[in-house]
Each structure stands twice: as C-alpha cells, then as structure tokens.
C-alpha cells in the first residue's frame, strides 16, 4: 500500500534561527495528534543538521531541496548527497521546476543526482511538470512522461520503487492558479500508467505521487480525495504552521 505524504518545500526562505523555530513549532503541533500521512519538511542546506537534531524525525522527515550531481571533489559551493545524508536528512527534492528553469538542470544531470541520492540512502522526491505553453499546446502528457522516462527509467525496479514523485504544473507554482482535482488526477494516472508499462503494476501502484502547485488548506482535501493523488509538495503554505497543519490534516 503506498503512503500518503505531505512534504513542505521552504525554498530559499528562513534564516537558521527562524527555520529552527518553525520546525520546532510544527513538531510540537503534531505531538499527540493522529495523522494519516507522512510529514516531511524540505529546508535549505544550512538548516538540515540543526533541524534533524532538534525534532522527532520519526514524526517529521527532513529533506534537502537539492544535491550535487557529483560524488565529491573540486566543485566549489556544491553539496553532495553524502553530505546531505550525514546531517540526518532522509529525503532530497530533485528536479524542481525552479532548478530546471534557473539552473538549467537537464535529465542527464538529474539522473546522476537521483543515483547518488539512492546510493547514499536518501529517498528522492523527484519533480516533473509542464509549463503553460506545453499544456495549451496539448503536449503536457508527452512532456511529463518524457521527464520521468529520461531521468528515471535507467533505474532498476528495486531502486525505482524507492522514489517519491511529485507532479507540479509549472503554471500553478506560486501563481495562485491550481490544477483542478480532475486535472491533477488525470496527470497522476498518466504518470502511473507510464511507470506500469516500464516496471509493472505492482511498482506503479506502490509509488506515491504528490501534487505540487498552489496547494493549500482550501483545496487540499479535494485534491487528496482523488485515487492517484497521494499527497502534496507544498511551497508557500509550508512556511506557516497555521497554513501547513490543515493540509496535513486533509487526509
């Protein structure tokens, strides 16, 4: 049975002190609550070790927002998957549309990141999604399937089964626009069908696919009610416990 997951992505927000306070506040808010999903927070690199040490990581998983596509060496400013794992983080977001757009991350680069994350015991949260022009041209299914195939389909079945996927229609990120629950379901089902064709139904049905793109307390319950939507990758709303908690409780 695949897991329901709500993962926050703080992006480039919060100083170390602010991030630590937010993580502790969320940890305290979840204590004693019965929740029906796994909770993850994706934080900037500088927060990882402090937050992993300060909260109950059986209650909240900690994720990096990126990792390098190289193992180690003379790559000034980069942070390796091994370094991320050494902080106590257990997850890493890979392939977010902002990384693809602003830092020109291609499928071959992302493939290396995924492999290094897996070899260091991290669970990748791999992001895919189309821009508005691609959707309006009717190419959204083709684009998203290609993103999955090019970066991930060299993995063997065992490694692929360790992944979490996140569908984020780029036109809905931070814009206030949201894919309808039916649009999200349609794409998630398409992704699952592509996985089944490559790895079989058992692997496809075991893969959690999250929705990312202006998901909030008002629309989370409807989105999460769809058969192939297994949770959310939450941006802005994850920066406030008051906004993040209702999304967690939408399951």
Curated annotation (Swiss-Prot):
GO terms assigned for molecular function: triose-phosphate isomerase activity
Predominant cellular place of this UniProt entry's protein: cytoplasm
Subcellular location: Cytoplasm
Superkingdom, taxonomy of origin: Bacteria
Pathway: Carbohydrate biosynthesis; gluconeogenesis; Carbohydrate degradation; glycolysis; D-glyceraldehyde 3-phosphate from glycerone phosphate: step 1/1
Enzyme Commission (EC) number: 5.3.1.1
UniProt binding sites for substrate: 9-11, 174, 214, 235-236
Active site residues according to the UniProt entry: 96 (electrophile), 168 (proton acceptor)
A GO biological-process term: glyceraldehyde-3-phosphate biosynthetic process
PROSITE patterns with a match to the protein in the record: TIM_1, TIM_2
SUPFAM superfamilies: Triosephosphate isomerase (TIM) (SSF51351)
Any single Gene Ontology cellular-component annotation: cytosol
Function: Involved in the gluconeogenesis. Catalyzes stereospecifically the conversion of dihydroxyacetone phosphate (DHAP) to D-glyceraldehyde-3-phosphate (G3P).
NCBIfam families hit by this protein: tim
PANTHER family linked: TRIOSEPHOSPHATE ISOMERASE (PTHR21139:SF42)
Family, per entry: Belongs to the triosephosphate isomerase family.
Protein name: Triosephosphate isomerase
